[in-house]
Amino acid sequence: VISHLAGADEPAHPKNGRQLEAFLDVRLRLHQGQACLANSSAIFLGPEYHFDMVRPGVALYGLGPVPGQPNPMAQVVRLQGKIAQVRDVDTPQTVGYGATHQVEGPGRIATVAVGYADGYLRSLSNKGTGYIGDTPVPLVGRVSMDLITLDVTSIPAHLCLPGAFVDLIGPNNPVERVAEDAGTIGYEILTGLGRRYTRVYVGGAGGTSGAGGA
């Protein structure tokens, strides 16, 4: 017997206990057959929700079980974009579609080859953040179909040359924070990552391997 909790990501939700009681009742009627109730968030509600097996889904990627609360797991997803070009801006200029951001003084803008066609949500326009090393670089202007623009004025020029990588999700910028900036949930961020990204799998019995995107 298998079921799913409606409020597992809210530990205090009263429906969790009521659903558990109903599940126990059904299981008794089915002569103690194999039982599974807990998804990723429900695993953390306690052993009474575990039964014979659990269904970790997004937890396999280190996403926190309760939005807005400290994450007990290590994040295992890292999303990087490659810098395509860097332009010096010497006079006031606008950036991107709709001219929604203006660079007022001398600065540098990096164009990164990631966009909403890759699942980097357009709602991150003028809100997203990348990291070069441990230094944040703000996303400026709108997210385009295939490109984003980052203000890299604070980064030494030799660290943000074309071909260098920027962390869009990583140790300094976890999925939960990206989701909050985008006004959504981590599930949407992860499931939306497009086929054009190259997947690299690190660790495990197979060591390191890569899978090319379309």
What do these predicted regions represent?
Residues I2-K82, V86-D90, P156:
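Active-site loop/helix belt of alpha/beta enzymes
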Residues D88-A214:
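C-terminal accessory subdomain/extension
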